């Protein structure tokens, strides 16, 4: 990994490498308001992107109009050339500090979707994310297949337990951004989110 960063730095590819993570981690982000009625849905979507012509934005495998009904999105205004850099952080493997260093060096903000284990075991890195102006989103407490959770109480528990850890750690409310684990979601998840 060290060699990768050295080579990338020499070739000026640090931001390009970080941008590639966005492509690899492309999943639905829900701007959750933690409210709404629940309706059962058996159809599970395994989130993914497909890429068309060079220079064109990727297309998701869920219709943007459908997602918009639930205040969910995977990309914003396509007329504006903006890249939203996001990371899923379920465990620490030594990469987060160098990523944060690179983001800071280039003054690039990012969003980190964290699970409970990360919040519990990496408090210094979480605080650093917040102090350096990054956004921390909710990736659930235990990273289950949320599309398999049918009752709203269990669904909320996964999100609220993570929110409580974040609040205890940072003294702030966790932003209402949710990314479903494994990229799996269904209509009832969108309604509960």
Question: What are the functions of these language-model segments?
Answer:
Residues 2-86, 91-105:
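N-terminal pre-catalytic segment of deacetylase/amide-hydrolase enzymes
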Residues 99-106, 119-139, 193:
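Acidic (Asp/Glu)-rich catalytic clusters
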């Amino acid at each position: 990994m060290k060699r990768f960063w050295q080579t990338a730095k020499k070739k000026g590819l640090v931001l390009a490498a970080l941008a590639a993570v966005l492509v690899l981690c492309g999943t639905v982000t829900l701007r959750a308001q933690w409210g709404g009625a629940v309706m059962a849905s058996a159809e599970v979507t395994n989130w993914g992107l497909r890429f068309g012509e060079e220079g064109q934005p990727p297309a998701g495998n869920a219709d943007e109009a459908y997602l918009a009904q639930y205040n969910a999105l995977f990309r914003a205004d396509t007329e504006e050339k903006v890249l939203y850099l996001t990371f899923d952080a379920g465990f620490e493997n030594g990469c987060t500090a160098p990523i944060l260093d690179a983001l800071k060096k280039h003054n690039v903000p990012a969003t980190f979707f964290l699970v409970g284990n990360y919040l519990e075991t990496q408090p210094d890195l979480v605080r650093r994310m917040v102090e350096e102006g990054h956004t921390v989103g909710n990736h659930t407490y235990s990273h289950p297949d949320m599309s398999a959770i049918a009752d709203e109480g269990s669904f909320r528990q996964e999100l609220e337990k993570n929110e409580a850890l974040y609040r205890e750690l940072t003294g702030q409310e966790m932003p209402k951004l949710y990314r479903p684990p494994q990229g799996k979601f269904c209509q009832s998840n969108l309604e509960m989110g």
